[in-house]
Design a protein with these regions (language model features):
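Hydrophobic positions on the alpha1 helix immediately C-terminal to the Walker A/P-loop
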Residues: 45
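Loop/turn-to-beta-strand initiation segments
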Residues: 59-61, 110-114, 146-155
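Mechanochemical coupling/switch segment within NTP-driven translocation systems
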Residues: 61-64, 68-117
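Substrate-engagement module of ASCE P-loop NTPases
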Residues: 91-103, 134-158, 181-182
Length: 198
């Protein structure tokens, strides 16, 4: 398996009868962001990806922060690394503490660790301004330093405006847009490919 997780199949090649896998090499491209309008399949995709990580990445630890707090991740209730709604701050803190423990040598392991945050933008909008800025700062540290310690971030939300990530948005090396994307979203996240995306 190495350091790869299959994300899906190449649609163009599949249309020609060639099932070619699209893989995420998390050692080279540590962080992912998934975005799309309501009903675009973000939750389905992220649940499938988390299941693949759990099955195929040895000793993976996944911290799930479900700010939406509906039934999509309710099956995780009771799990120690599952945080809903207001408790998502605890999940973010746990990920930062994991990074700090690996930095200072208290945790010498380098096993795969993923912070998954569903509806990051809604979470920030829920917080007061000072708390939101602190949350963005903490996420930025994970995005900028996590790769060296095998710590990864997966964010799922409707829009990926820079305001939600400070200067760290460019640290998302895998960007997945689902559903019918607006021209603005295409220009913002896929400017190099905007002519190819219809």
């Amino acid at each position: 398996m190495g350091t790869h997780v299959t994300l899906g199949l190449d649609a163009d090649l599949l249309a020609s009868g060639i099932p070619s896998k699209i893989r995420w090499d998390y050692s080279r491209y540590p962080h992912l962001v998934v975005f799309g309008a309501t009903g675009s399949g973000k939750t389905y995709f992220t649940r499938l990806l988390l299941a693949k990580i759990g099955k195929w990445v040895p000793h993976a630890q996944i911290c799930v922060c479900d700010f939406k707090g509906d039934e999509d991740f309710a099956f995780l209730s009771g799990c120690p690394d599952f945080f809903r709604f207001e408790r998502c701050s605890e999940g973010l803190e746990a990920a930062v503490k994991k990074l700090e423990a690996r930095q200072n040598g208290a945790d010498p392991s380098r096993s795969f660790y993923l912070l998954f945050f569903d509806e990051w933008a809604a979470y920030l909008n829920y917080l007061d301004k000072k708390a939101a800025e602190e949350a963005k700062r903490r996420l930025s540290v994970l995005l900028m330093l996590g790769r060296s310690f095998n710590i990864h971030v997966l964010i799922s939300q409707q829009r990926v405006d820079a305001v939600y990530f400070n200067a760290a948005r460019d640290n998302f090396s895998v960007i997945i847009g689902l559903g019918r994307l607006s021209r603005e979203a295409v220009n913002m996240m896929f400017s190099d490919f905007r002519e190819e995306i219809k």
